[in-house]
Amino acid sequence: MKISKFAEVNTVSVDTIRHYIDLGLIIPEKKGGHYFFDEYCQKDMELILEYKRLGFSLNEIKDLFLYKNLGKSIDYEKNTFY
């Protein structure tokens, strides 16, 4: 879905979505200068909103996402190479 619909579905502004993209919290596909958001973006957005509801700052959320993605990378390496 496009950025305006993604923002509407998640009841946040388009500027907020762009800010999350700039921080690397959401990584949508980009085609011809337009962002497209899939189910992975939606899951990440739901996590962001939940962490914010719990009182985490965006920097803390960014760190949590880093650890989450690092864990996936380590699992991939274990499954691939060992």
Name each region found by the language model.
Residues 30-35:
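Short, Lys/Arg-rich nucleic-acid/phosphate-binding segment
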Residues 20, 37:
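Conserved active-site tyrosine of GNAT-family acetyltransferases
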Residues 17-18, 48:
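Short, hydrophobic-biased segments on the C-terminal half of alpha helices
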Residues 24:
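Glycine-centered, phosphate/nucleic-acid-interacting loop/turn motifs that mediate DNA/RNA or nucleotide
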Residues 6, 13-16:
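Short glycine/proline-centered loop/turn elements that form peptide/ligand docking sites
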Residues 2-8, 27, 39-82:
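Arg/Lys-rich, alpha-helical DNA-contact motif
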